[in-house]
């Protein structure tokens, strides 16, 4: 059993692709180059604990997982958890402002216009007053909502694990339209893609390996493109697409990462993920992030990659034995990412070199969140950690 006490450590035994091609021997190379495995020596101190808050008592559970993420506005931190309780906390101390039972949460709430838009595991979009926690309205969909909704000037758009995209009025919650993707009869991977809104189009993907662009006003299909490659199962598009310039970047567990023309869906390039040492790896992408110049991709079993916008690999660090990845986060020169069975990694985003590592004892499945110079991350035991980030 893993220890329950958190550990903060420095550089890990993770070697990037550049080192695999030849670099000076160092003590960090004593470990398996592709394993998520910390070893000495310690590296740089980039985080210090500010406070922590227990959202749920999960000490007696075997291998629990928490996917909820925080959202921060001014001096308040908002967060839910699998326990069903939702909290507003003082950012300075972690003290409770108010709490409300809304149902299990596996994503970040979206603050907008004095309201909080929250997706729940029972398929409800719940809207609360951000100051008081009073419920304004809720809309019930037919599948668990595991990605944050997107709030526009007049609509709230969200997706769920039933391969649905739903748009409702942002003020009243009145139904506007719904699009249903085809769900395969075979088993699919856990999770689903969120929605990316760009102008008048909404981009998302489904468990059948299809990426679609929907018209925002009607939900009708502008185009659809298969990202399945040659796979017959486990072809899920579970990472939320990213729009940069005239391209949309997306991924599937069977096809790797794609760049497509955002207006037509035409594939510009594709980078498949595969490792000869791991022929059974799903390669399911936990998330995409970009600084506008590079893409950062976390793929199950295979590691975290940095790509340029033409699909060339800049570096790679391994994740074998680390568990499922969450979406990476960019902060200044750093890249932050978490692995479900290992913890939180803080790396130099230019090289992939890990600078610091935080292991709460039970791994981290949730995406980290950065607000200003504060880092917030939820452990699998339901503890929200607030760090000062340097």
Where are these predicted regions, by residue range?
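Blade-level signature of beta-propeller repeat domains, shared across WD40, Kelch, NHL, RCC1
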Residues: 360-390
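Loop/turn-rich, solvent-exposed surfaces of beta-rich toroidal or solenoidal domains
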Residues: 294-305, 309, 316-346
């Amino acid at each position: 059993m893993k220890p329950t006490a958190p550990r903060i450590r420095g550089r890990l035994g993770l070697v990037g692709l550049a080192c695999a091609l030849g670099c000076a021997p160092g003590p960090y190379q004593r470990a398996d180059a592709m394993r998520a495995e910390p070893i000495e020596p310690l590296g740089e101190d980039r985080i210090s604990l500010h406070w922590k808050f227990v959202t749920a008592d999960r000490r007696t559970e075997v291998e629990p997982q928490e996917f909820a993420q925080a959202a921060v506005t001014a001096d308040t931190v908002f967060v839910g958890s699998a326990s069903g309780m939702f909290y507003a906390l003082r950012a300075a101390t972690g003290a409770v402002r108010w709490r409300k039972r809304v149902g299990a949460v596996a994503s970040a709430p979206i603050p907008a216009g004095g309201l909080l838009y929250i997706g729940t595991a029972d398929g409800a979009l719940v809207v609360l007053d951000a100051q008081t926690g009073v419920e304004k309205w809720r809309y019930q969909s037919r599948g668990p909502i595991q990605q944050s909704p997107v709030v526009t000037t007049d609509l709230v758009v969200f997706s769920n694990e039933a391969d649905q995209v739903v748009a409702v009025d942002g003020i009243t919650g009145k139904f506007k339209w719904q699009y249903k993707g085809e769900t395969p009869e075979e088993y699919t991977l856990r999770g689903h893609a969120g929605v990316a809104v760009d102008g008048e189009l909404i981009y998302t993907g489904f468990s059948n390996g299809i990426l679609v662009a929907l018209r925002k006003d009607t939900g009708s299909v502008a185009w659809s493109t298969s990202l399945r490659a040659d796979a017959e199962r486990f072809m899920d598009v579970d990472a939320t697409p990213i729009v940069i310039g005239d391209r949309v970047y997306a991924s599937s567990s069977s096809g790797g990462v794609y760049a497509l023309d955002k207006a037509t869906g035409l594939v510009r390039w594709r980078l498949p993920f595969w490792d000869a040492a791991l022929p059974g790896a799903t390669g399911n992408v936990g998330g995409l992030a970009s600084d506008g110049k590079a893409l950062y991709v976390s793929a199950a079993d295979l590691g975290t990659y940095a790509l340029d916008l033409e699909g060339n690999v800049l570096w790679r660090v391994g994740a074998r034995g680390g568990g499922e990845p969450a979406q990476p986060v960019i902060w200044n020169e750093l890249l932050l990412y978490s692995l479900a069975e290992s913890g939180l990694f803080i790396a130099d985003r230019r090289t992939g070199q890990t600078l610091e590592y935080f292991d709460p004892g039970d791994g981290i499945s949730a995406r980290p969140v950065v607000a200003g110079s504060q880092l917030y991350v939820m452990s699998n035991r339901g503890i929200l950690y607030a760090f000062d980030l340097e």
